A protein has these predicted regions:
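Acidic, metal-coordinating helix/loop segments flanking the phosphotransfer/catalytic sites
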Residues: 37-56
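Receiver (REC) domain active-site loop signature in two-component systems and cognate sites
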Residues: 63
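C-terminal output helix
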Residues: 114-123
Length: 134
C-alpha cells in the first residue's frame, strides 16, 4: 500500500493488475490526492477497516478474495462509507457487470482498456462528485 500527504483528500484504489494500480495512483497523486493502494479486494477491505476517512474509491470489478461489487455493497451498508463515491473498472466484456456495478452504488464505470485521457476524465468526474458531497 502506498500513501502520501493528503491535500485534496484520500482515495482508496484496488486493482489486482499492478500496472493499472500504478497508473491510477500516479494520476490521482498528480491531481493532489493521497492514495491508499490495494492489490486485491481483501487488502481494500482491510484499508476500509483501518481508515474510514476516504474521499473516493476506485475498484476493479474482478479481483481475488473480494470483488469490487462485493466491496461496494459492503460500503453501502456501513454509514461511515455509504456516501463515498466509487468508480468501477473492468476488462470483462459482460455488459451485466456495468449494470450490476451501478446497482451496487457505483457512480462511474470505466471499461478496460482505456486511454490515459479517458481515465483522467473519469477520475476528475469521480473526485468532483466527492468534493461536491463534502
Amino acid at each position: 500500500m502506498s500513501s502520501s500527504t493528503p491535500t485534496k483528500g484520500r482515495v482508496l484504489v484496488a486493482d489486482d493488475d499492478p500496472a493499472i494500480l500504478r497508473l491510477v495512483t500516479t494520476i490521482l497523486e498528480k491531481e493532489g490526492f493521497a492514495v491508499v493502494g490495494a492489490r486485491d479486494g481483501r487488502e481494500a477491505y482491510k484499508a476500509l477497516q483501518d481508515n474510514s476517512n476516504f474521499t473516493a474509491a476506485v475498484f476493479d470489478v474482478v479481483m481475488p478474495h473480494i470483488t469490487g461489487p462485493e466491496l461496494l455493497r459492503y460500503m453501502r451498508t456501513e454509514k461511515r462509507f455509504n456516501k463515498i463515491p466509487v468508480m468501477m473498472m473492468t476488462a470483462e466484456q459482460d455488459p451485466k457487470l456495468s449494470s450490476d456495478s451501478f446497482a451496487a452504488g457505483a457512480v462511474v464505470f470505466l471499461p478496460k482498456p482505456f486511454t490515459t485521457t479517458q481515465l483522467q476524465t473519469m477520475l476528475r468526474m469521480l473526485v468532483g462528485k466527492a468534493i461536491s458531497q463534502s
